[in-house]
């Protein structure tokens, strides 16, 4: 692992797609020791460009023994990152309440498109949906022409992963003073709307 400002910080990442892995890649690039929990039977981590700089363990989170392994990793971690739909981690027995029982200093980072609560919380969505609702899509492109979708740079990575990484770093700093963990609830639509605030 590389040294950097997050050297000595342990992160447990629950494998997902898009902004969660990108956030963990950034944390790893800053020196954090990231262990990614992959689903048993899924594709190899080596094929994922954003998986650089971290180790992986494959677990079946519907198996009580594997959940116990995950909780043991969480107990020794500084940070947890997950990007599932609201309620999934709680149903697995790995939500913030359960995790804080084994590690009260844990920074629990959550990434969703719409947030943990609200009318769209459980709706499916993708980067294009998040940047459209936040107004960013309308602002991209030339006047009088259709918008030019910016891949998933504005929503998933800009409004999502970067805001979650910034929240995690701030929470780690605060935990040094308070000795307490906290939940970072990063919604891609919120981060993208914040980016639009400078326009």
Please identify what each model-predicted range represents.
Residues 21, 44-45, 91, 116-118:
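Generic structural signal for helix capping and beta-alpha/helix-loop junctions
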Residues 1-41, 71, 83, 99-109, ...:
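Acyl-CoA thioester-binding alpha/beta core of soluble enzymes
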Residues 12, 51-102:
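A structured beta-alpha segment of the ubiquitous adenosine-cofactor-binding alpha/beta core
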Residues 29-61:
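Glycine-rich phosphate-binding loop and adjoining beta1-alpha1-beta2 segment
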Residues 26, 30, 92-199:
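Active-site-adjacent "lid/gating" segments in soluble enzymes
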Residues 18, 41, 87-89, 114-115, ...:
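Glycine-rich nucleotide phosphate-binding loop and flanking beta-alpha elements
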Residues 2-3, 47-49, 100, 121-122:
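Short secondary-structure boundary/capping segments
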């Amino acid at each position: 692992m590389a040294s950097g400002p997050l050297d000595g910080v342990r992160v447990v990442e629950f494998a997902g797609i898009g902004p969660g892995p990108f956030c963990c890649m950034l944390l790893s690039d800053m020196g954090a020791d990231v262990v990614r929990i992959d689903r048993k039977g899924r594709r190899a981590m080596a094929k994922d460009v954003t998986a650089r700089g971290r180790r992986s363990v494959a677990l079946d989170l519907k198996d009580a023994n594997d959940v116990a392994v995950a909780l043991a990793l969480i107990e020794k971690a500084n940070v947890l990152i997950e990007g599932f739909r609201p309620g999934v981690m709680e149903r697995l027995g790995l939500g913030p309440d359960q995790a804080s029982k084994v590690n009260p200093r844990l920074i629990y980072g959550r990434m969703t498109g719409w947030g943990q609560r609200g009318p769209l919380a459980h709706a499916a969505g993708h980067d294009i949906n998040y940047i459209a609702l936040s107004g960013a899509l309308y602002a991209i492109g030339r006047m009088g022409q259709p918008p030019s979708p910016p891949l998933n740079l504005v929503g998933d990575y800009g409004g999502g992963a970067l805001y979650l990484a910034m929240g995690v770093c701030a929470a780690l700093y605060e935990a040094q003073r308070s000795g307490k963990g906290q939940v970072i609830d990063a919604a891609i639509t919120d981060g993208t709307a914040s980016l639009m605030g400078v326009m």
